[in-house]
UniProtKB/Swiss-Prot annotation:
Similarity-based family: Belongs to the PDS5 family.
Gene giving rise to this polypeptide: PDS5B
Compositional bias segments (type: Polar residues): 1382-1398
Keywords: Cell cycle, Cell division, Developmental protein, DNA damage, DNA repair, Mitosis, Nucleus, Repeat
Stretches of the chain forming a coiled coil according to its record: none
Subcellular localization, as worded in the UniProt entry: Nucleus
GO CC term (a single one): nucleus
Keyword Repeat: yes
InterPro entries assigned: ARM-like, ARM-type_fold, Pds5
Name used for this protein in its record: Sister chromatid cohesion protein PDS5 homolog B
Amino acid sequence: MEKTPTQIVSELCSRLLQLSRPNKDSLVKLLREVANTLSKIDQPSATNKEKGLKLIEAELRPLKKSIIKHALLKNRDNDVSLLVTVCVSELFRILAPHLPFEDEYLRDIFTLFIAEFSELSDTVSPYFSKRAKILETVSRLKFCLLMLDEDCQDLVHEMFNMFFSLVREHHQQSLINQKSMKTQQRKANTQQTQHSLFNNILAIMSDVLEEEANSSFVVVILENLVKEGEDTTSGADKLASSLIERCADRLEPLICSFLTSCFMEKDSIQTNLKDSYHEIIFKISLIAPQMLLAVIPKLTQELLTDQVDVRIKALNLAGRIFAQPKHCLSSYVETYQDLYAEFLRRFSDKSAEVRMAALKCGKQCYFANPSGNKASGVLTAIQERLLDFDDRVRTQALIVACDIMKFNMKYVPLNLISEASERLRDKKISVRKKALQKLTEVYQDYCDKCSEGDMTITDNFEQIPCKILLLCCEKNCEEFRSQNLELVLSDDLFPRLLPVEERMRHWVQCFAIMNHIHLKSLNSILSQKRRLQNELRHCLTLWRKAKVDNIEEAQRKKKSYFVKLSACFPDASEAEDLFEKLDRMRDASIFDVLTLLLEELSSTNAQIIKEKFLKMIGVKHSLFEFLRILSTKCSPSIFSSEHVQCLLNQLCGSTSANTQLKAPSIKLLLVILNMFPSYLRGSEKQFLKLLEENDSAADELIVVLSKAAPYISVNFGDYYPVLEKVCLEGTRSQTKCAVSAISSLAGSSEKSVFSELCEMLMDSLLCGRNIPTTLQSLACVGQYSVLEYDNIYEDITSYIYRVFQAEPSDNQLPCDQSSGCCNSCKLKIYGLKTLVKSFLPRHGQVVRKIDDLLNILKKTLKSQGHDGIKSCEDTGANVRLAAAKAVLLLSRKWDLHISPEVFRLTILMAKDSNAFITKTFLTKLYKLLTEHMIPSRYACAFSFSLSSPCRDLHDDSFRYINGFINKATRESRTCRDLDQGESLTDSPVYMTVFLIHVLAHDPEFPSEDCRDEHIYARFCGPLFSVLQVLLSINNNGFTIKETAPFLFCIFRAIKRAEDAVDSRKTPRLHILADIGYSAVNILNSIVVTSPQAPRSILLPSSLYSLTSITDNQNKAKSRTRNALEQSFIERIVHIFQSQISMHDQRCQKDSLAVGSEDKVLPPLLGNQIETSITGSTEASQNNTRCSRKRTHLGEHISCNSLSLRTVESEIPIKKLERHTTCAKESVKASVSNKITSSKHSGVVSALKDISNHGEAIIGQRIKLLSPTDGCFYPGTVEKFNSKSNSHKIIFDNGDVELVCLDSESWETLSHESMGQQERLGKETESYGSRNCVPEISHTLAKVTAQKQTTTTKQQNKKVPAKLNPPAVPCFMMSAKSKKGNSDSGEGSVSEVTDTSDNIGPRRSRRQRIS
């Protein structure tokens, strides 16, 4: 009979009992048989279970005894220990619920089990399955509860720690795989499903926690929950998470208590977990968010704490919580609502660090739930931070916004795109740089999605390129110059593989929303690219020539090219060095590739050439990066012929996509072809079709055609009919472009086309068909074909003369209500333009006389209906405006032929009664001046509107004249710095020469007997206004130190000159010069001397002249009678000065005066002067002795090509004596004339060598020469200082100075000549002698002496009486030579007007003694 398993176990164990000391082999053999047999024993059936258990227990008792007898529970051998553990576990399984061992042995059994469990980490061990079986048995029998019953808490803790240490990720994966297998095989084999190792461990630990959960277990679990280590395969955190999820109810109070302690009593916690409680909260929120309901309010409070670091940590935790999938917190929305609200408030936290942390958290929240309820709030908060006052926060907000746009581009809010794009205009450079980087990445993704069909083109994303173009407007950052932005448009804006068609779709949409500033920026980038390509072509040509003939001239040219080329690179200095290095390399292959790129018109082919080239030179090449940039810049990388062809195909195609995009498409086409007309090559037929179909853009297209003519191959006969039709029937602007295109396209064989065109145009003109267009066509023909135009010139002129003589109809209404100009006046204007353009040819020279045209212009400018010229009373101003503009345009080439009268009439257009006419004239004038299209003398016109009562005209004029002065001054200084000579005629100050002459011939000049200072103040308003602007301290042009002396020189020269146009107006010139001098003295609040003040000045001979000495002496007396008293002049100036003060006060009250540059001058020409002068006006400036500083006579330069002639003479000038009075008395001036002979013994004398005089001349009377005014001043030598080699001189007027006589011009005075020299000091012939030799009271002299400062001395320089004539004949006046000789100016070709008489307040460079 076969034995039962229990009997076999009993026999085997009985044999084991008989052994006293069994060896390992026999022991292992027996135990293995026992273990295998025990696995076959099952528990008895439930019907008779108790009886069956007792029988089995009796049969297995030998096993129990043998284990105890041989102390197998404590055996250290691994094999024996494992087999004993298996046998014990099987005993517990078979006899359950009865215990097979007594309590005293249970602890050893627990220890044995734990020891075997620790070996479970060795998954490759052959015994792993046996140990896993033991674990499964322990789990199923809830054996761990027995450990708790036996008070083996330490063993339980040890087991917990051991489980956490041995569990691995693949254990849990095994569980997942088994669950999947269960689902698939549930019906096949549901009885034999085995629990995984992870699940068994989890069951054991869960049973323990459900039975007895305490804080010690919680600490172990939480430690493993947030455990971080190098072992990435550890599954301790997953095990802890599973425990918390399974035993949430039991662990919740303990965990909440622990977390609350971390919030409230963090220092009292002894475990390291106190620093990881945020991580614990986050992990629990993922698995059991309901456990944190009591903890969340504490976290909300942390967001409100004062510590920044605490707020940041709490914010990061809240962000991670809300970044979970939306289903995690769906059941607890209300509980977490307060936390979410406070989380959003942290986006506007007072700390920048907190706001930046909030932005990062907001990004993760949006990524987790882009369509959730919380997403909109997060996006709004992020958008608001784009306007944060801290640039770091704005940068972070920009990064987050761009990442969000890339993540969810299709549904991102449009406002967020716009706000992010605005960061390209941020005030911080760092923000703009980051915005450029991130937004180009966004735009690339957007272009890819549009190309793939996932998105449609939208204006919001197309704003990005527009905003990038605006970076060109930045003047304070080199990174955003056009040199860098060209590379952005070439390489970074579009994906590299994006097709040309897709790129053009985006460009067209961009042009649909671009404004003029965007276009200007794009044009600047393209023009720089074109400039580099042109310069590089020249340089490559020179490089090839240099191979054969490398001369110094070639090197100089190359250096010039390198400077120009390097200016197109981000770092110009570095690029210049690299160009020189490339030159030294002499690599012909590089030059050949660059030539290919310059000649290539296709961007696709250019990209292939560029990639092959860069691959050829290699990344390790020393110039790789430089050549990469250079190859990009010289290739058609932004636009190409392919872009042009694509545009033309879209515009000419029958299935035009969108008519609204037609206009921007044409605009884009014009921008490309205007910069690169060669790109039209290959698309000539499509362009011709477009030209025939688009009347609205015909003029621009024709301009492009004329530019592209040298680069394209066309049949002239195909284009001529279209252009001819435009010349006959088009608009005036189209006609202008059409004639230009005909000239460009017509070859040598087609030059006769202009003859045929002229015949057709004359027939159209005489028949009265489309006269404005016909006149424009004829004018343009005259510019491009002078010979053909000369054949019909007489016919055109006679027709236009008849137009001017025609009577306007009384009932004729204006055909253009906006301009208010009738047809008759319009026709006159068109006729003027036709004649004027014919004298400004683009090709060839005009041999016709211009006198007739200038005569018409003069008559038109004078008045209506003069000499047969008829105009409407209401619209004649438009004709006068056209005539004035015509004079301005003609002055480019015909300025020498423009008479002073025509010049004056043109200038007076600035004071026309029609404000619109005046404003239009000034705008045109300023444009021509800034472009250097006309002589600078016309700038004096601004002074008339500068003193206009119309506020708008005044403001415009002030802006215009400031712009002109600043630009002219910079250019004048540049010439001076480059040693190109210095001439006062180049200075903006020189405009006063022409202004004074215009005023002198003004019919409104006050009468000779007028002594009303208000009338003079109103009339001289233009002069006062321009002087005020010129003497502005903050003017970017000349400073006062330079301006005031130059003005003095001008007024002195005018005082010595006569009116060349009408000698009867000479007294007016002198009166204006007197007023101007006094105005400078009063307006100039700083007493200055300038080492650069010229002694002589050029005056235009067409306006000013000199007569002989005898005539001057005969006329001096009569001119003196016509002169104004000094006190009257001062009252005139003070009226103007009071107006400035009143104006400044009003500006301050209205908070309008922001700075000195914003000050505007009060209107003086109108009827708004309300000044009351009671009594007399005090002199605004004390007189001092004339400065004795010598100035160098500069180079003679002609003025604006004006014909100047020379006469040398000494003109006697009136002497004005100023006396000091009390404030309540009137200032009286006595006028006297003194004719001083040129041989006056005291005026000029030879210099003496007095280097060794020392104390020998103490007490003697001497006279010192002032080099500025040529005056000698008498005085007495009081003492001598041997250390400084200087003498103390007491002058007769009370001044005391220390003088080094070694460097001065002086003479001793004999007793006979003493009185004569004193008279000389009082009666000098120089103009403004009232300032050269002041006669003041002792008190005033004392006050003046106290105001003087110590300055350095300067060596005297001899001034020649006669200089070599300049290239252009000049009129100049010369003072007497130092030897007293005076030359007659009759036969001299060129002389100098000596203005050495200092009419300004003097300041000596010697040391003044109080």
